[in-house]
Amino acid sequence: MKTPDTCIQLIVGLGNPGNEYEHTRHNAGQDFVEELARDLGQPLSPTPKFFGHFSRLNINGKDVRLLVPTTYMNRSGQAVAAVCQFYKIPPEAVLVVHDELDLPPGKARLKIGGGHGGHNGLRDIISSLGNNKDFGRLRLGIGHPGNAKLVSNYVLKKAPSEEFNAIEDAIRAAQPHVADLAKGDWEKAMRELHSKT
């Protein structure tokens, strides 16, 4: 599949709000964006008009917005659509960071477009963007419990320390590649990240 050369203008970290969900598997995307904002010295702040916590920063001369929706996971699209409409950001300039059952902890994979794969956050974003699936995704592996009936309980729990550390390692490995994505160099970001994790 051809990689795009679209510069990423919005990075969205998916998760559920509230202390009971902090650092659960389902909040891996939120953890990524919160750590990125902190590391770049631009912490997120509550922004009601965007239904989430928001920050705006400069990465290598490129204007990039960071968003963590404070709606629940299955309403994430409300926040994404609000930012995209306000700043006139096309779906292909959006990167959604989310937990991925089909990858083991410690893996991080970039992907362009595609379906929602049963992920309620992705499902709502696709719907809120007018059924547009063209946004990028950073998939952070959390592993699978082995039985579909166990998934909803599994994703809302904290991972055991070994798995949690592997997820954190993947988050740290992926963060430097945001600079490549901000300038539209998907090919380099994919090649280097996928060889590391």
UniProtKB/Swiss-Prot annotation:
Binding site for tRNA: Y21, Y72, N74, N120
Site feature: Discriminates between blocked and unblocked aminoacyl-tRNA: N16
Organism the protein comes from: Saccharophagus degradans (strain 2-40 / ATCC 43961 / DSM 17024)
Pfam assignment, any one: Pept_tRNA_hydro
Cited CDD domains: PTH
Name under which the protein is recorded: Peptidyl-tRNA hydrolase
PANTHER family: PEPTIDYL-TRNA HYDROLASE (PTHR17224:SF1)
One GO CC term, this protein: cytoplasm
